[in-house]
From Swiss-Prot:
The modification Phosphoserine is found at S177, S179, S188, S206, S215, S222, S231. This is Endoplasmic reticulum junction formation protein lunapark. Residues 216-225, 334-343 have a biased composition (Polar residues). The gene is lnpk. The lineage of its organism: Eukaryota, Metazoa, Chordata, Craniata, Vertebrata. It comes from Xenopus tropicalis. Signal peptide: none annotated.
């Protein structure tokens, strides 16, 4: 009858079996802890009571029952000396007994753990994902701890750099424009995959010049995406993975500006409304905003595809002015003056013949100096000829009137007449 009833009984589920095993494991672990505590308690009690008994018996024997014979005293001494050895032996027996109990308990515990692990492996193979996940989270805390350790530690929130959000928006818009199909009938099934692929690109793109992005495995849908006619050869998956490149050619002004910023922009004449966007000719990415004055003359390298965008116009250059070095002119005039002072005037006239117009342009001071020099030479010649005449023709008139024989006054008159003629 019992066998028939056992056949009709329902087989316990894996959850019930695991619950029963969990209870047995907990009881065995509690028993192991209790066993260790009991061993310490019993050993301590043994030492405590044995020492008290040893002291009391030794005092009573010494005070009241000490025998008079020598042999009886030796026997009592042997008994007292063997008592500590007996206590030590009892202590070892207690330790061995408790250790055997703990070993048996540990063996049963290990057996239950191995069976539990086998059942959990069967659950992972046979049960559905949801049921297996619930069972593992409930009955396998060790694996849950390992998974928690393997998960990355959440770091501080990373503030996007200026231009990063704009870059992500442009990348997402470019992906949407690339992946839109030509046929309107095929548009609806491709939208969910496209929307799922867009956040991954937004997560993986980073600001130019920043740390390298995490490696992204290209999804099969991103490989299926077709390029637009006239679009660059770079694919969407390749654009998300690249090393840190050059910085933006010009900064991107923030969208959210305060009242003070707007007032300053109005006074200075700067702001987004007064700037032009630098768009790459190859990948159509936003590379900052340049001023109106420099927009036509800016050449920049794209921060995303590294394409060199030439300037639309060449900046006009003003003609170079002739450099006038005043120090060199002063040195030349000084050297010419020193050479003219060393050379005689005749040699200067031969080496540097001047035109009559240049002669007329000479200053009157130079003419006066030349006239004075000629007068001085004439007077010297007259003074040299005067003593010779006096020696050859000595006249009484000269002896009587020496003042009249002085030829200096007529010479002075002649010099004045020559000076007037030269003027």
């Amino acid at each position: 009858m019992g066998a028939l009833l056992a056949k009709w009984r329902a087989k316990p589920s894996t959850v019930e079996v695991l619950e029963k095993m969990e209870k047995d494991i907990q009881s065995l672990e509690e028993f192991r802890d209790k066993n260790q505590k009991l061993r310490k308690i019993w050993v301590a009690r043994l030492f405590f009571y044995s020492t008290i008994l040893y002291i009391l018996t030794s005092l009573t024997v010494y005070l009241w029952y000490l025998p008079d014979g020598m042999t009886a005293r030796l026997l009592t001494m042997l008994l007292f000396l063997s008592f500590p050895v007996l206590i030590w032996f009892v202590r070892t027996l207690l330790i061995l007994w408790f250790s055997r109990r703990t070993e048996r308990n540990n063996d049963a515990l290990e057996l239950l753990k191995t069976e539990k692990k086998k059942i959990l492996e069967e659950v992972m193979e046979k049960e559905t994902y949801k049921a297996a996940k619930l069972i593992l989270e409930r009955f396998d805390p060790d694996s849950r701890k390992i998974k928690e350790l393997e998960l990355p530690v959440p770091g501080p929130p990373i503030t996007p750099r200026p231009g990063q959000d704009l870059r992500q928006r442009t990348a997402a818009q470019r992906n949407i424009s690339v992946s839109t199909p030509v046929n309107p009938g095929q548009e609806s099934p491709q939208v969910p995959g496209l929307l799922a692929a867009t956040p991954s690109l937004q997560r993986d793109t980073s600001a130019p010049g920043g740390p390298p992005e995490r490696s992204v495995q290209p999804t099969p849908q991103s490989n299926i995406l077709q390029r637009r006619p006239g679009s660059p050869a770079t694919t969407v998956s390749g654009m998300a993975i690249h090393p840190p490149g050059p910085p933006l050619a010009r900064p991107i002004l923030p969208r959210e500006r305060g009242a003070m910023d707007r007032v300053i922009e109005y006074l200075v004449g700067d702001g987004p409304q007064n700037r032009y966007a630098l768009i790459c000719q190859q990948c159509f990415s936003h590379n900052g905003m340049a001023l109106k004055e420099e927009f036509e003359y800016v050449a920049f390298r794209c921060a995303y595809c590294y394409f060199l965008n030439p300037a639309r116009k060449t900046r006009p250059q003003a003609p170079r002015l002739q450099e006038i070095n005043f120090d060199r002119q002063r040195q030349r005039t000084d050297s010419q003056g020193s050479v003219s002072s060393v050379q005689p005037p005749a040699a200067e006239q031969l080496e540097n013949p001047q035109s009559p117009e240049a002669m007329e342009e000479d200053s009157p001071a130079q003419a006066e100096e030349q006239a004075i020099e000629e007068d001085s030479t004439c007077s010297e010649q007259q003074w040299e000829e005067a003593p010779d005449d006096s020696e050859k023709d000595p006249s009484p008139v000269a002896e009587l009137n020496p003042s009249e024989s002085n030829p200096s006054p007529p010479a002075a008159n002649e010099t004045e007449e020559s000076f007037m003629e030269t003027e």
